Amino acid sequence: MEFMIEDLMEQLIDMGGSDLHLSAGLPPYFRISGHLTPIGDHILTADQCQRLIFSMLNNTQRKTLEQTWELDCSYGVKGLARFRVNVYKERGAYAACLRALSSKIPNFEKLGLPDIVREMSEKPRGLILVTGPTGSGKTTTLAAMIDLINRTRAEHILTVEDPVEFVYEPIKSLVHQRQLGEDTKSFANALKAALREDPDIILVGEMRDLETIALAISAAETGHLVFGTLHTSSASQTVDRIIDVFPSERQTQVRVQLSNSLVAVFSQTLVPKKNPKPGEYGRVMAQEIMIITPAISNLIREGKTAQIYSAIQTGGKLGMQTLEKVLADMYKAGTISFESAMSKTSKPDEVQRLIGATAPPAGVKR
């Protein structure tokens, strides 16, 4: 049996899947609503895997892959979708993971984003971070925010991504999108150049290293609105991660810079729905939201990040919310199960406290 890569992609989209995995010695796998599922029982050979993977690559990409054994790129099927592609080697054969990217940028209502996220998109300057594990919808949240700016403001938007996922057609804004490996050698190089390209809005697809983080903070300090992502699971952890990247002799200065430039942190995760309706997306987003107030700015400046959680707890009137509060509310509304709520928190006792008497007895699933 011979597979065509575009047939597998179409089947993935038809089934509402998010990821396609190709590996020698296994059938293709789809991730649907967070769960991996083998597709059929035909085992892919190493040659079949390589043929499927190489059919998505141009000559330059093939040469890069043969030299480095790893590759990030994107691939589009007209009329279907675009895909983020990562190719790697395992047990001597090529394997790949393809993430389906919607060609339509979802709006705030469809994503279920709180109004405060929209409000933060309207800020003229500062640093806004969307954080969470891989596959938590960070890029989608950022896309909704950038799309709102594009539709409502005459700005120059510059993005640096690896790879470009959502394509923005200029509406009110001028939009330039740069892809790592095709348009720039590194995030840091692109950010250095960006400051000479008259941007109003800068999106950094991933703040991976000290130089990129330092440049993003500096750009926010100098009057730009900067969006970025980190693989952190909470607002306080995000602050610590940024500070810890720098050597100890620079950390005091960076705390001051961050306290002055940071606007908001949205730390998010996707939680399986309890009873999704037919055709409905099987996961729901849960966000911890930290808005920088003078009090939180002082906590960052003074290195008292352990107190940030309490500040978020008391900041509900400003639009702030802890992840635990959101999970508890979703459980009480019947949107998610108790097990799902507990699996997404590092503070299970807090979730249990917020759920209160509605929590199931020990050993009982709900």
Region locations from a protein language model:
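Short, flexible helix-loop junctions that flank or precede catalytic/ligand sites
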Residues: 1-366
